[in-house]
Each structure stands twice: as C-alpha cells, then as structure tokens.
Amino acid sequence: MSILSFQMPEKVVMEKADDFHGLFEFKPLEKGYGVTIGNALRRILLSSLEGYAITGIKVPGVLHEFSTIPGVREDVTEIILNLKQVRFKKISDVNENKIVVSIKKQASFKAGDIAKFTSAYQILNPELLICNVDSNSNFDIELTLEKGRGYLPAEENKPAEQIFGYIPIDAIFTPIKNVKYSVENTRVEQRTDYEKLILEILTDGSIHPEDALKGAANILIKHFMLFSDQTMTFEAVKAEEEETVDEEFLHMRKLLKTSLADLDLSVRAYNCLKAADIKTLGELATLDISDMMKFRNFGKKSLNELEQLIIDKNLSFGMDTAKYKLDED
C-alpha cells in the first residue's frame, strides 16, 4: 500500500521585510497544518531566541531599588523600569558585560548615552529616556549585561556571591516584540480547501525577521529529530530517578505563585484583578479572555497589558495549573 504524499509549499515567500518587520507566506498546506505550524513557530519565536538585556545595576550610594538619588528627578524604581526597555545589539566580539555610564552636566540620561561608554553594543532605541538629571549634578551607574532567552525575573539574576549595592532587575532577553499569524484558504487546481499560513514577525532590530524565523525553525527541527527512528530509544527509569525533583516544575510553581502586587501592573489593571479576587499570576493564567472582559472597568488597554505580561512570562491564558499544586506550601 503506497503512502499518500502531503501537499507542502515548495518555498517560503517573504512578502516584505526590513530590520524590524517581516511578513511571510507558506502555501499550500494540508487542512489543519496552518494552525499547527503557525502556533509552534509563534511560541518558539516569542520564548526561545537569544538576546541581550540589563540584568543588574550598581549606583554609588544606593543600596536598594526604593532609594532616591540626589540631583535625579526619578527614583531608582522608575530608572529600573526604563532600563528594562533598553534594547541592545552585539556589534563586536569583545566580551563586555559591564558598562560604566557617567552623565555629567546634561539635563537627561537617554539610552543612546550608553553607547558612548561601550564599543561592543549598539543601542536600538537611543531616544528612550532613562532619567532627568540636574544639570549641576553628576550621575554614575554601572550596568551588567548578559545574554539569555525569554524572560528572567530579578530573583534569578542575583549573583552567586552577594555584592554590596548590586540591584538585580527583571531581564527581557527576547528580541521579538510580537508575532501574529493567520490562516486562509487557498486553491490548488480544483481544490479550495488547502491552507495558506501568513506569519508576521516584529523584532527590536537586533535580529532580522528572516533570521529569527530560520532560528525558530531550526530549534523545532532539532527537537523533532529526537523522535526520528535513528535517535528514539526507550530506557527503563529507575525509581530513584522518578523521585528526583524537577527543576522546571519548581520554577513554574514559584512563578505561578508570584503575587500580582509584586509585578509592574498599571493601577487600573491591578485594581480590576484585585476586585475580582485575582491575587497571583497563577490565578490570572487560568482565566480566559472572555472571563476578564466581564470584570468591572476592564477594557482593551488592560487586556493588552495582561496579554503582554502573560507572553513575557512564557505562560498562556486558560492554563491548567492543577499539576503545580499551588495550594500547597
């Protein structure tokens, strides 16, 4: 009995692309494969590509994030929020993970000023305001940069040995700002039930959308190769190995138990969730979008904010969190 062949695209069509935006088409695909491929690529693109981000800061005379700095209008918490948004592109092979920035006699500190103190990185959003400085004051700050994937909370960016005055911060490494996909019907000869997948990728400029798509596809290919006949093996699992604590399980459990009060939510979004008795990230992740739209004073702006939060944390709405035993201490 012969094996029926699948209808597959001969190539990927790049409709348009620049350093920040790419639009790609895959056609024709068998029915159902548009969503299957589109969703897999979207999740990998958002969570698994590498990038650079600030993971910690050190300011002379500052011991914690709730401090204020003489001659600087913003407090340290606001400065950290702004630094989390700075996007970097590595342009040199120099291994530089510390940047000391010194702002002297200028009214503001913008992201572009960081480039004056490093030759290893390009700042992709130079006009981003970090803080306002009294023109008669000086402002010095040491930035720690690291390479990583996805998102890491400040707790996981703490150095192995405690450093006096060092403040770890949340790091958003992913170079992908957004990914959208849609599936349309397409014709092959007389049949009109084949599918066309349209994939739209928005990056921060540190990676070209075409390279991002290739990188995500290669990650999937490497994982799927594990299921090929040549590499698939079955080994008996020892009882003691079954009792080994799963680090990923513990990480996810800790993340889901994070209090919403500890996250950088807007006042409106936080109050809407608080009124609905939603207190933790895990409780938020179990909700469906339709559930949230029923909340009092909850609108599209709050929904967009929470959708981005869920993406940044590599979660999804409608999650089944029962297996993480969040009710247990």
Swiss-Prot record:
It catalyses: RNA(n) + a ribonucleoside 5'-triphosphate = RNA(n+1) + diphosphate. The keyword Transferase applies. GO terms for cellular component: cytoplasm; DNA-directed RNA polymerase complex. It comes from the Bacteria. Gene3D superfamilies: 5' to 3' exonuclease, C-terminal subdomain (1.10.150.20), DNA-directed RNA polymerase, insert domain (2.170.120.12), RNA polymerase, RBP11-like subunit (3.30.1360.10). SMART domains: RPOLD. Its EC number is 2.7.7.6. Residues 247-329 are annotated as: Alpha C-terminal domain (alpha-CTD). One of its GO terms (molecular function) is DNA binding. Pfam families: RNA_pol_A_bac, RNA_pol_A_CTD, RNA_pol_L. The N-terminal domain is essential for RNAP assembly and basal transcription, whereas the C-terminal domain is involved in interaction with transcriptional regulators and with upstream promoter elements. DNA-dependent RNA polymerase catalyzes the transcription of DNA into RNA using the four ribonucleoside triphosphates as substrates. Homodimer. The RNAP catalytic core consists of 2 alpha, 1 beta, 1 beta' and 1 omega subunit. When a sigma factor is associated with the core the holoenzyme is formed, which can initiate transcription. Belongs to the RNA polymerase alpha chain family. This is DNA-directed RNA polymerase subunit alpha. It comes from Cytophaga hutchinsonii (strain ATCC 33406 / DSM 1761 / CIP 103989 / NBRC 15051 / NCIMB 9469 / D465).
